[in-house]
Amino acid sequence: LYIVLCAQMFKHLPPAGKRVIFQLEQSVSSRWFTQNYMNILTESLGVLEYSLTNIDFLAKNGLKYPNVHYLPIGASLDEEFEGNATQKKYDFVFYGDSLSSERRRRFLEKLQEKYSVKICNDLFGDELYAIIKESRVVINIHYYEGALLEMPRICECISLDVPVLSEGTSDQDEY
């Protein structure tokens, strides 16, 4: 059994009957919810979904229980990070795609007028975690208007003991 995250990013996937997709995209935009991606989800053994809004979207598109299961994401403090006070270099850190989002770029430029802001576009794993820990706050700026709350990102930061400042969301009543 294979559990696949970000399935839309891979050219080749494990066999449909042996894979479960952990769906982490937002249904408020068709950027990732293409017909090909919907086919990948539908053909898979199962889909794990963190957002009730996304579950409703999937159901309206014919993909529902028993093939879709709600699995909310939560923070889990790793002992490796507990009590690791790190010197703060940045007021804010933003990580994600700021290059193709004019909305995010404008927001970040305005923030940089008054604060020290570190922008990470293509950084992952331990390198990213080290920078997050050097920040007073992680800023969460939506790619889309009316976006869902980016719980995977928020829980990742909370697990690193760094607070997150986020815009409001269309699904904030879920949290």
Residue ranges of model-derived segments:
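Nucleotide-sugar donor-binding catalytic core of glycosyltransferases
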Residues: 1-17, 21-175
